[in-house]
Amino acid sequence: MREGNLEAPTRHPLDWQNPEFHDEGSALKEMERVFDICHGCRRCVSLCQSFPTLFDLVDATDDGEVHGVKKEAYWKVVDQCYLCDLCYMTKCPYTPPHAWNLDFPHLMLRAKAIKHQKGEVSAKEKFLASTDTHGSFAGIPIVVQAVNAINKTKTARKVMDSALGVHPDAWMPTLAAQRFRWGRAMSNTAFPAVNGQRTPGKVAIFSTCYVNYNEPGIGEDLIKLLDHNEIPYVIVDKESCCGMPKLELGDLQSVARSKEANIPVLARYAQEGYAIVSAVPSCTLMFKQEIPLMFPDCADTQAVKKAMFDPFEYFVARHKDGLLKTDFKAALGKVSYHIPCHGRVQNIGKKTEEMFKLIGQTVEVKLNTVERCSGHAGTYGVKTAYHPVAMKIGKPVFKAMAKDEPDFISSDCALAGHHIAQGMAQAGTPAKALQHPLSLVRRAYGL
């Protein structure tokens, strides 16, 4: 047997509807097998807290072997995994097609699904993962202002700590006064659709919960870039949460319901020749990877997968097609750019970095790229139990992002961006300005 893979990793479909998937004994046996291999390798120790937790458990046994770890302690490892997928995509030498067939993230997902089925996921965690529920207040006059103001008070944060398990010091997004999908044209078809070799000539925007409820400006910036490049677009006429927060809980039935709400709508756009673009990497990843692996035989799901683009994957491909304008006018100066985990594991390359370098051919851009997990990881970074760990994981990123006192810090993941800004401020190296990459490209165009 060869030591490690010489081939690109492949992913097996998630056999989540097989009764054995939820069999705890079977899952624990597989965890012991995988943990034993991980213990003998330890390449992933610098990623999330799952691996230090596992290795500490092993090292505390009498003989330093996995068989000495009590099975009930395995769940400590599971709880620290936030499904970033970096171990699978960037570190593990034993992923399929290797004979050892390791898929650590999906094994952790299986364990989380077992916990969820057993009723061991708290109501607090379920509420935090219900983005459409707490986003429902967005855009309601007076209510938005009241909720945002209250959530900034120490009293409210103490209540959120006890009632919702949200750490008092964790950054929390505010609700938007105007939702992205409200009070605006839902399409611009004034331009003809010009297909390129690599890109469809028209775009369907999946707005995402975060852009719709929290930072609609990111969506507006995307639209400005499409308009400037004369690319017709539509905002998809109906959407629900992509399901990523529920996936992180192991609530696969809720993910399936999200799929049933979204895929028929998105498949129509895919079949009509649209590129489907989402400005949140986790949402893009759900439609590119996780939902297709859960429903490998669903033709509509596979059609959506093929049509789904990260924004800069689309714009860079558009440039290679000779169909992107490069009339940049405004220098960006020093930019510290963070590549988020769920952007990296899409296996599309560093497309946002490529875009910044393209801008730098016309105007000044001094780019500092940081390629490491920020530690935020969706709801993980705001939870009382994990926020201090999330800040610890992010420390190398906070330090690297502060290099050369950048004019802007930026991340494709807006949540990671705010987490990094908080960490930099706590380290005494506060960022001058936090801007999403789409916002910076809009600035560079002078729009």
Residue positions per predicted region:
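Conserved oxyanion/phosphate-binding beta-strand-loop segments in alpha/beta enzyme cores
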Residues: 1-8, 45-50, 179-195
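Non-heme iron-sulfur electron-transfer modules
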Residues: 2-21, 46-82, 94-124, 429-440
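Active-site-adjacent bridging/hinge elements
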Residues: 16-25, 59, 64, 85-86, ...
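Short, intrinsically disordered, charge-biased short linear motifs at domain edges
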Residues: 22-35, 66-81, 227-229, 359-363
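Cysteine-centered iron-sulfur cluster-binding motifs in ferredoxin-type domains/subunits
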Residues: 31-51, 75-102, 111, 134-141, ...
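Secreted/processed peptides and extracellular or luminal domains of membrane proteins
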Residues: 44-50, 54, 87-93, 98, ...
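A generic structural-conservation signal
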Residues: 47, 57, 90-91, 235, ...
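Iron-sulfur cluster-binding electron-transfer modules in prokaryotic oxidoreductases
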Residues: 102-447
